[in-house]
Amino acid sequence: MHDKILILDFGSQVTQLIARRVREAHVYCEIHPNDVSDEFVREFAPKAVILSGSHASTYEDHQLRAPQAVWDLGVPVLGICYGMQTMAVQLGGKVEWSDHREFGYAEMRAHGHTRLLDGIEDFTTAEGHGMLKVWMSHGDKVAELPPGFALMASTPSCPIAGMADEARGYYAVQFHPEVTHTVKGRQIIERFVLQIAGAKPDWIMSNHIEEAVAKIREQVGDEEVILGLSGGVDSSVAAALIHRAIGDQLTCVFVDHGLLRLNEGKMVLDMFEGRLHAKVVHVDASEQFLGHLTGVTDPEAKRKIIGREFVEVFQAEAKKLSKAKWLAQGTIYPDVVESGGTKTKKATTIKSHHNVGGLPETLGLKLLEPLRDLFKDEVRELGVALGLPPEMVYRHPFPGPGLGVRILGEVKREYADLLRRADAIFIEELRGTTATTQDAAAGLCGEADVGKTWYDLTSQAFAVFLPVKSVGVMGDGRTYDYVTSLRAVQTTDFMTAHWAHLPYALLGRASNRIINEVRGINRVVYDISGKPPATIEWE
């Protein structure tokens, strides 16, 4: 029986990151809405409770509170951002609107020597104060500590940025330790979970395989399952896991919607039929998809259409399988959170995903999502544990809607053909270029990264087609052709990301090749936006 951490979700977009950090400490956790009953909290029997952030305000909204049972259990509690504020209010403190809202990077001073922060610091001031580089995102502030609490941290704009009641094991921070921008955030959460809560670090992927296989077999029984392959990591690992559980009861449906990467169809069929020996049905539905996308420019509408057409194709294939009762998808946690699909339904929707946003109730198939509670790095770990080849597991993610969300505005076959070739050239250059000692000296990578390809050093890289034309000169003639943007990011969880600082020489070669080899593109730009504020995909 695993020790469990209960994460109460108040609607933050990054609540799942808290779960990821807890699991990185090899401790099992679950996310549940903040308004669960006292009985549920008691029956869950957590080793500790973590209260998430929220886009709401404790000062204005008095409905979002933690159940009373949280305070009656006698277990450690960690409040994060809004979680700190509701802890303060519920335990007798005071929260008010801040005149100095904090959004982004901040330097925070630790006070005292609490068990949570003692010895954890990024640098020390000349006066000897330990400082932490943290990520803030709040408009309210704790103005008065609850009885029994002491000041744990502060910033110039937030006098109470952390508080602690060590006797009861209650800790709260105004910053977000779960995001990668907080340098020591992972260490802080690990200390809370392992040392303060005393949870056993026994959550590993091999255990998850056994549990997931058993769950799939129990759910499916002797019924048949169809799964749509996109060529990406998520659907590949989902297929391998389900195949491990039920073998030939699984039929993989590979849909060519006309929005695939260059030579993707052949690669997917060779990999799954040749390596996994799985049943794969190849469906060419490119005319159907592109026809329905004609004239559509709104990103949400495009995603909905692509999702709807996937469902129709699956329904048609399911009718050919007499026992097909299940539709399997490679949905993972980031898909769910970006669709406003956390269990509380309080998160603000950023964009819908075809995996979770276009499935009608009239589908006629039950939904099987074995990866729904996993993050991308966990999915990769699971793939390795399942014995999948590295070229499959560590391939960059590819969205289900394919190039449809990498072509801005209306999707046309002409645009898709241009983008396919530009994208392939960019990936070739990333795969063919290794990091050098000069790159490390310039701060583009770490010394341990020297010798690795830039494809392996980036988490996701691709080209984006911009349906605008610019003037150029090639030879002695004037050109008026399209623009493409290159995008490469580095991240551990895909909830936040930094743009990749690629060598100029690599970018120069990619640009030169695209302009010379892809007739119809005469300008290449590089996207240097992080997430947040941008998302990784452009649409």
From Swiss-Prot:
<dbReference type="InterPro" id="IPR022310">
    <property type="entry name" value="NAD/GMP_synthase"/>
</dbReference>
<dbReference type="Pfam" id="PF02540">
    <property type="entry name" value="NAD_synthase"/>
</dbReference>
<dbReference type="InterPro" id="IPR004739">
    <property type="entry name" value="GMP_synth_GATase"/>
</dbReference>
<protein>
    <recommendedName>
        <fullName>GMP synthase [glutamine-hydrolyzing]</fullName>
        <ecNumber>6.3.5.2</ecNumber>
    </recommendedName>
</protein>
<dbReference type="Pfam" id="PF00117">
    <property type="entry name" value="GATase"/>
</dbReference>
<keyword id="KW-0547">Nucleotide-binding</keyword>
<feature type="domain" description="Glutamine amidotransferase type-1">
    <location>
        <begin position="4"/>
        <end position="202"/>
    </location>
</feature>
<comment type="subunit">
    <text>Homodimer.</text>
</comment>
<feature type="active site">
    <location>
        <position position="176"/>
    </location>
</feature>
<dbReference type="InterPro" id="IPR029062">
    <property type="entry name" value="Class_I_gatase-like"/>
</dbReference>
<feature type="active site">
    <location>
        <position position="178"/>
    </location>
</feature>
<keyword id="KW-0067">ATP-binding</keyword>
<dbReference type="InterPro" id="IPR022955">
    <property type="entry name" value="GMP_synthase"/>
</dbReference>
<dbReference type="InterPro" id="IPR001674">
    <property type="entry name" value="GMP_synth_C"/>
</dbReference>
<comment type="function">
    <text>Catalyzes the synthesis of GMP from XMP.</text>
</comment>
<dbReference type="GO" id="GO:0003921">
    <property type="term" value="F:GMP synthase activity"/>
</dbReference>
<dbReference type="InterPro" id="IPR025777">
    <property type="entry name" value="GMPS_ATP_PPase_dom"/>
</dbReference>
<feature type="binding site">
    <location>
        <begin position="230"/>
        <end position="236"/>
    </location>
    <ligand>
        <name>ATP</name>
    </ligand>
</feature>
<keyword id="KW-0332">GMP biosynthesis</keyword>
<dbReference type="Pfam" id="PF00958">
    <property type="entry name" value="GMP_synt_C"/>
</dbReference>
<dbReference type="InterPro" id="IPR014729">
    <property type="entry name" value="Rossmann-like_a/b/a_fold"/>
</dbReference>
<keyword id="KW-0436">Ligase</keyword>
<dbReference type="GO" id="GO:0005524">
    <property type="term" value="F:ATP binding"/>
</dbReference>
<keyword id="KW-0658">Purine biosynthesis</keyword>
<feature type="active site" description="Nucleophile">
    <location>
        <position position="81"/>
    </location>
</feature>
<dbReference type="GO" id="GO:0005829">
    <property type="term" value="C:cytosol"/>
</dbReference>
<dbReference type="InterPro" id="IPR017926">
    <property type="entry name" value="GATASE"/>
</dbReference>
<comment type="pathway">
    <text>Purine metabolism; GMP biosynthesis; GMP from XMP (L-Gln route): step 1/1.</text>
</comment>
<feature type="domain" description="GMPS ATP-PPase">
    <location>
        <begin position="203"/>
        <end position="395"/>
    </location>
</feature>
<keyword id="KW-0315">Glutamine amidotransferase</keyword>
